[in-house]
Amino acid sequence: MASIKETFEWAIPISDEEKSKIWEKAILTVDTNVLLDLYRFHPETTRQILNGLESFKGRVWLSHQVASEFFKNRNKVILDAEKNLIAGEEKITSLSKEIESTLNKALDTLLDGLSSNRTISKKLIDNLKNGLKGKTHEIAELSDDIIKNFTSEETTKVTPQKDDILLKIIEIFNKNLGDSFGVKDQENLIIIAKERYKNKIPPGYKDENKEDNTYGDFFLWEQILRYAEKENKSVILVTSEQKED
């Protein structure tokens, strides 16, 4: 007689005890975006993620699909991150100048009005002018400090040729890379994926109309299943995607 727990195991929430055992013994793997996001995040966030991956040392594995997608997109992500950094600096500088200019104009208008008032002493007006002018300079200095933080040694300095993040990824996953599919195997998987996509069966059916990497999520899922079965171990997949498929 069939067991409900065995038949519908995928639909039954696991207990806290089972979760604890999984975290203690399972293999950790990541999707492509987790690796690429290391170039997009603030350096401190990147360090924390890499430290978290390192804490699983001896229990990590990287699928061939993710490694392929990572190296295909790495250079573009690095260059895009650099462009975003420059754009951020320019926005801060522009906003600072705009605020300083607006305050100075308002201050000049105020002082002109006070100067025409004979009941107010020139000394008081000069003191007010010097004090308020100092505040506008403080705004400019604050902007400079923010930009220095953008461009300081704390900011991840990465180029396609000089890449400490890549070195760390290799150090963590180097000897734990999964196998690729053979040509015939991949052709058969594409046939299966097409049928699944027609019936909105995850993973990956939302990518059906993509021109590039249409079956990437499905290939990753298949490689994880094969690895878990081969090693007879649970696998934890860390992903930053939030798509329904």
Regions found by a protein language model. Name each.
Residues 4-235, 243-245:
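Active-site-proximal, substrate-binding regions of enzyme catalytic domains
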